[in-house]
Amino acid sequence: MSLIVSDRFRIVVGLGKSGMSLVRFLANQGVSFAVADTRENPPELATLRRDYPQVEVRCGELDVDFLCRADELYVSPGLALATPALQQAHARGVKLSGDIELFARYAKAPVIAITGSNAKSTVTTLVGEMAAAAGKRVAVGGNLGTPALDLLSDEVELYVMELSSFQLETTDQLNAEVATVLNISEDHMDRYSGLPAYHLAKHRIFRGARQVVVNGQDALSRPLIGEGLPCWTFGLNKPDFHGFGLREENGEKYLAFQFENLMPVRELKVRGAHNQANALAALALGHAVGLPFDAMLASLREFTGLEHRCQWLREHDGVHYYNDSKATNVGAALAAIEGLGSDIDGKLVLIAGGDGKGADFSGLRAPVARHCRAAVLLGRDAELIAQALGDAVPLLRVDTVQAAVEHSAKLAQCGDAVLLSPACASLDMFKNYEERGRVFAQAVECLS
């Protein structure tokens, strides 16, 4: 049975990955719709014309009168709701919605909903692996991998969804079984008026949630709504009731729940305090939906991390090389610098820079001074980072990732680690952060 009123007209705005999933979904529901995109040649245009030749599509500047033919616009997350044409249509009574709102209406199985400025892909993947190890028929996606609407199936027993602030802007009621904001730090300041607006967008994830998971060391992760809901916490401190954290016994550090040690930290294959926090967050989310500890701990012991996320590449001349190209904001870079820096015997040589998206880099100064031997800077906002770091460590400016690797190898000493953690987006020099990470990995491989 369709939950969409079929005699109304919709327009899908944005023909990328999520937009195409909306097209497939609406077509299967028998709904009348059209498509619009600000780009002249959007990524999925050929697919749309091949599979749905009857669907009207408008490319280029958005036509407000065309948009106002619809009762509802399904806006892809890549397009800001502040876009004038969307605002004008909304002012004339057209509802703005998105794919996650539709997903929430149709999903029959419980949903674990995960957002945060950093670590959401790692935690989402890890929880999905835990659920699979527990024998659940689990579907994992959203902002990560498969679009939400493509995951819908009566066979699914549990959904694990990574959600971005952009997706949550068009989601009124998610109704997750358990929801979390892993952490909040400045990101996408080129799209938001400031941190409060970004914070409010993230916290839409808690609307209708039955349980919440809170980062006990980040006050901004605590829900603005939902007092009285079951609440589980995680953090790198000693846990108390309903809490996941770290306990120390006889010189050994353990992942723990309440007053019980679960497993030694040394058994994790991923290094750094930030990865310990990710493991604890995943345990809290899994526990909230009843996943058994034996399956969750077995998954933790096997988890080797995700590509481009503080990923160990190789050891060369006593120096370890880590690819954290996914660190596209200051908060992510801070997590890697603090987490890895406190976990190695030597110092870090940091490679950073790119498109800062209007971020404030001043928060990097203290941890860089504490954990780094030097910083090698590149990209559009290298000078802004240099100004923020001041005289905290020696600075070197280069033009390419290859040069950054070569100079970092000379600066590093035995026992050190070279860390690519840019604190910036990659689009000033690369197609995406994945390409940046691959170029870095290739340069590291070429060291001899």
UniProtKB/Swiss-Prot annotation:
One of its GO terms (biological process) is cell division. ATP binds at residues 116-122. GO terms for cellular component: cytoplasm. Keywords: ATP-binding, Cell cycle, Cell division, Cell shape, Cell wall biogenesis/degradation, Cytoplasm, Ligase, Nucleotide-binding, Peptidoglycan synthesis. GO terms for molecular function: ATP binding; UDP-N-acetylmuramoylalanine-D-glutamate ligase activity. It catalyses: UDP-N-acetyl-alpha-D-muramoyl-L-alanine + D-glutamate + ATP = UDP-N-acetyl-alpha-D-muramoyl-L-alanyl-D-glutamate + ADP + phosphate + H(+). Pfam families: Mur_ligase_C, Mur_ligase_M, MurD-like_N. Its EC number is 6.3.2.9. Pathway: Cell wall biogenesis; peptidoglycan biosynthesis. Coiled coil: none annotated. Its main location: cytoplasm. It is found in: Cytoplasm. Cell wall formation. Catalyzes the addition of glutamate to the nucleotide precursor UDP-N-acetylmuramoyl-L-alanine (UMA). Belongs to the MurCDEF family. PANTHER family: UDP-N-ACETYLMURAMOYLALANINE--D-GLUTAMATE LIGASE. This is UDP-N-acetylmuramoylalanine--D-glutamate ligase. It comes from Pseudomonas syringae pv. syringae (strain B728a). The gene is murD.
